[in-house]
Amino acid sequence: AVMFTKNTEEAGGNHWAVYHHKNTSAPETDYLKLSDDTATADNADIWNDTEPTSAIFTAGDHSGSNRSGDDFISYHWNEVQGFSKFSSFVGNGNVDGTFVYTGFRPAFVMIRRSSSTGNWIIFDNKRNTFNVVSNALFANANSAEGDLASNTPLDFTSNGFKLRNSDLTGDTNINLSGSTYIYMAFAEAPFVNSNGVPCNAR
């Protein structure tokens, strides 16, 4: 499960608090901020130290999720086989990078390093209609689209995505050796359609 929650009344420094079930070994006590590149924050209050279910999420005594009298907005996603996948992977620092299996050809992938600081990096199949997928947007920044083609970030395949990056460093990298990354992926087409026919690679 993934949740984006925002206090719409908090003055100054307000942010989107992000829950991702693969963020850490205890994601119910941790959160990331969609609005910046800071590392995971450890706070048992934000989700009341409670893992969400398919029907209920719990907010504790925290200004980012449940301050008394304030209004909040919250968006929630759950995995649907063949259509959405929210998980994690470990980078290997090589141009022959990690392959991430999703079970579908992606239309949209957002990646964030969870083991340290890092940008929320977005790739999709509309701005790059064929491989290599290199036109990146950053959810936490107001900068223009970045073309990362010289570093060949990733390929979209019929059943996931393949990292191709070894040169970028720090917050713009999606494949640092030993670093853990979380991602959200939504499908263009399932690996196998409703008739049992495999979809084509790009």
Which ranges hold each PLM region?
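Surface-exposed molecular-recognition determinants
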Residues: A1-R202
